[in-house]
Amino acid sequence: MAPRILLARHGQTEWSLSGKHTGRTDVPLLEEGRVGAKLLGERLHRAPFDGLPDAEVRTSPLARARETCEIAGFGDRATTWDTLMEWDYGSYEGMTPADIQGVRPGWFIWRDGVPRGETLEQITARADEVVAWARSADRDVLVFAHGHILRSIGARWLGLGVDFAARVRLNPTSISTLGWAYGEPAIESWNDTGHLA
């Protein structure tokens, strides 16, 4: 069977709750985020996942992703990987979309990018690196990371431009599975938060 990639978004933080662009700022999880990470871990240790005993696990080195990985019960198996870090928002770090549009009307990150941060081409290259790694694996892979990079990985898995990521939501402590259908890359599940209900 061809390998799949499971995408786990980190738990809720103060900045994600308020809508601030949180790239490289190392903010911790809120208590709500820790609870969500625990529930995510319980979900991943039940059928059909059963703890993913054969999966390779990687996590962003940023605290919110690492802590989610650890609380979910995968910390001892995880390798940190800088490629999974969130988009470097440059001058827009810590700002909400409304703040940015106040000074740059019509701004849209997936079209316009960010000043003094990563370009769309750079985020695409990082997403492509993750996709290539996952497809070359001899087993399923599980990654703990961030909203924009995970959405970009989803788009690139399907062979689409990263701007497609603007059309999909990805909630904190959600799990998504990218796999195959009829021999082609497919989304098996997306933004699944059933464990939080």
Regions found by a protein language model. Name each.
Residues T59-S60, A125, F144-A145:
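Short beta-strand scaffold positions
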Residues M1-R4, L40, W87-A98, A155-A197:
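Acidic, low-complexity terminal tails and accessory targeting/binding regions
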Residues I5, D138-F144:
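Residue-level preference for the first positions of well-ordered beta-strands
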Residues I71-D128, G179, A186-S189:
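Phosphate-handling substructures
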Residues I71, S152, R156:
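Active-site signature of alpha/beta-hydrolase-fold catalytic machinery across serine-
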Residues G147-R151, A181:
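GST superfamily/GST-like fold recognition
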Residues A2-D76, E118:
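Active-site-proximal alpha-helix that buttresses catalytic centers in soluble enzyme cores
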